[in-house]
């Protein structure tokens, strides 16, 4: 069955997405960091992720490590105000789910109070305790395995994971442990396509790939990557569907030229005084200082 790009109308839910996976329908997820990106993407995708990637995409950081709960809350609230139909997932930033189950629950619960439908956290077996704690509090959790950006220092950079036998088998074990702990879906990032396919076929929950080949239950890309809004290095797994950076610069350049040439604004883009005030304004002079 093929699908068009027509807008989705019904509100996405976790059971719905899991049913789609059983039916063979692929899930589409992208990032949203503010109300504008949410309104553009929401009619089209199934999941909106308020990702901690906001740090390097929008806030100028080199990676996601400096992103705080306060920053994530700010961006989540902006997206949630649009009342999206897509499932709204918020990323747990670095050190927001590491110290204790109590703090993890408090932070994740704050996301749900601000409008998120679920949270996403990175890591495998080490995170099982936190996942169970959240699920026991009725907080839906999406897991994230493979190239986990918050582990960039431990991994020695943004490198493909799971290319060695031990690493590949560990990832498969981690995927099952996260499923058993209650995750409703898993992001698989930066791993060989064959490994992602094996994980997907062995799980009952959806997998959402990014740099993990075509045989996941769905795919996610950063909004700005899809639209070509980023300069510089583009990862191999990114397919860009527009040169948004150039298009926006060209539009701004045309506007700037119109301003400098005195052709913006015109009378059609200006407000007019009532006719009876024209003479009053024309005859105005500064009052003398007292």
Model-derived features with residue positions:
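Alpha/beta enzyme core
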Residues: 2-242, 246-275, 279, 283-290
């Amino acid at each position: 069955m093929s699908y068009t790009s027509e807008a989705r109308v019904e509100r996405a839910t976790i059971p719905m997405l899991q049913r789609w996976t059983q039916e063979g329908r692929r899930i589409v997820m992208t990032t949203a960091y503010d109300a504008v990106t949410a309104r553009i993407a929401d009619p089209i995708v199934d999941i909106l992720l308020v990702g901690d990637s906001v740090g390097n995409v929008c806030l100028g950081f080199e990676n996601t490590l400096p992103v705080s709960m306060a920053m994530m809350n700010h961006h989540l609230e902006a997206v949630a105000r649009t009342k999206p139909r897509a499932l709204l997932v918020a990323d747990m930033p670095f050190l927001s789910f590491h110290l204790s189950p109590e703090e993890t629950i408090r932070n994740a619960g704050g996301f749900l109070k601000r409008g998120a439908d679920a949270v996403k956290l990175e890591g495998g077996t080490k995170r099982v305790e936190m996942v169970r704690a959240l699920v026991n509090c009725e907080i839906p959790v999406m897991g994230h395995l493979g190239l986990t950006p918050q582990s960039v220092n431990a991994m020695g950079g943004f490198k493909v994971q799971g290319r060695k036998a031990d690493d590949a088998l560990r990832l498969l074990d981690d995927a099952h442990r996260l499923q058993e702990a209650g995750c409703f879906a898993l992001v698989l990032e930066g791993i060989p396509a064959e490994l992602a396919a094996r994980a997907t076929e062995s799980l009952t929950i959806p997998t959402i790939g990014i740099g993990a080949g075509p045989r996941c239950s769905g795919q996610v890309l950063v909004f700005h990557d899809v639209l070509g809004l980023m300069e510089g290095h583009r990862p191999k797994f990114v397919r860009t569907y527009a040169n948004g950076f150039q298009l926006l610069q060209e539009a701004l350049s045309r506007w700037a030229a119109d301003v400098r040439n005195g052709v913006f604004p015109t009378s059609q883009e200006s407000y007019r005084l009532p006719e009876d005030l024209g003479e009053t304004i024309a005859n105005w002079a500064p009052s003398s200082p007292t």
